[in-house]
Amino acid sequence: MSEQIRLPEDLHDKVARFPEYSFGAHRVCVILKDGRFFEDVIIGGGEVVKVGGSTKIPFTQDEIADVINRA
């Protein structure tokens, strides 16, 4: 499995305000700066830990523009 990536610092507080999806994890949609988006992203401990059923995280920290709650 791919390494986890840190969520940009400016989005940590936003995600922390979302309801938990499961045991401290948050389910979000990640929006990238180029307009692409990824549903079913799991954030835990300020890190992207899973993207859908993928074994890789298909974006980098620098590409993340925003997150939307999907809990």
Place the predicted regions along the sequence by residue.
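Motif-centric detector for short Cys/His coordination patterns
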Residues: 1-71
